[in-house]
Swiss-Prot record:
Stated name of the protein: 3-dehydroquinate dehydratase
PROSITE patterns per the UniProt record, alphabetical: DEHYDROQUINASE_II
One example of a Gene Ontology biological process annotation: quinate catabolic process
Catalytic activity field: 3-dehydroquinate = 3-dehydroshikimate + H2O
Length: 149
């Protein structure tokens, strides 16, 4: 049996409103729906998945710090912090855990202020515009990278 992978999923501000906030942009699934499906998918592949959603930047940073030497890979949807947070960038660089940046909407097809990410250039990859499936694609990619598949 392969060794269990420990994966952390982080979701930033306002993602707790998924399913009610702008469903034409973000889809109709709630964050709980997305995380439950992802957790089930992860368990089938011997991946232990933990999750945090926070509207507070410092809580996301603390969770990243706590992940040092405990977590193998991070999937992060930084939401609005994508475009503003040097602190999240520095935290991710500081722990040196590989990560994939995920966005439900295509940020490049939206307002110009959403086109810049403080994380993309240090991420293993970026998935945007594919809705909730983007999390599943990120999970599969993380597993592939860690297991050299």
């Amino acid at each position: 049996m392969t060794q269990q992978i420990k994966l952390l999923v982080l979701n930033g501000p306002n993602l707790n409103l998924l399913g009610q906030r702008e469903p034409e942009v973000y889809g109709s699934k709630t964050l709980d729906d997305i995380i439950k499906a992802l957790t089930d998918e992860a368990a089938l592949q011997n991946v232990a998945l933990s999750h945090l959603q926070s509207n507070r930047e410092y809580e996301l940073i603390e969770k990243i710090h706590d992940a040092f030497e405990k977590i193998d890979f991070i999937i992060i949807n930084p939401a609005a912090f994508t475009h503003t947070s040097v602190a999240l960038r520095d935290a991710l660089l500081g722990v040196n855990i590989p990560f994939i940046e995920v966005h439900l909407s295509n940020v490049h097809a939206r307002e110009s202020f959403r086109h810049h990410s403080y994380l993309s250039d240090i991420a293993q990859g970026v998935i945007c515009g594919l809705g909730a499936k983007g999390y599943s694609f990120a999970l599969q990619s993380a597993i592939g990278k860690l297991r050299n598949i």
